Amino acid sequence: MVTTNFEDFYEVPDLNFDISRLRKDLEKILKNKKFNSPGVTHFGAIPINQIPNDKSSITGSNIRGKYWTIADDTGREVSRDVDIDESKYTQLVPEFEKTYFKEVFETLKKKYKLGRVRLLLKEPRSTLSWHKDPEC
């Protein structure tokens, strides 16, 4: 496994997670989970939480949600996709129930206001375009 030097990252005091455990559980999730990439090249999202008992909250456009981007040379921001009430995303997706992600999610939820939480999978040498997400 590749090791990463995190010396230039900001460390949140009193908050430590085991990256190796996350990676191990991620590998299990990736083996079992088919992720949806709704018509977007080089974008794969695996939702970690959902609206309680609403499977549609983690499919289609709900995976991406509304964002703003500069789409052309006018320099004006335009909104794309659908509005999502991030505050409703409070239930862990069942695939993550028996993983270390649950412990991390619960710890973060106690300290911070969370909206949708998802894993974004990016192919090597690919990036997301400049964009701005709505604030919770």
Predicted ranges, named:
Residues M1-E106:
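Non-heme Fe(II)/2-oxoglutarate
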Residues T107-K111, R116-L119:
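A short, contiguous structural element within a folded domain that forms the immediate neighborhood
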Residues R118-E135:
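Conserved short histidine dyad/triad with adjacent acidic residue
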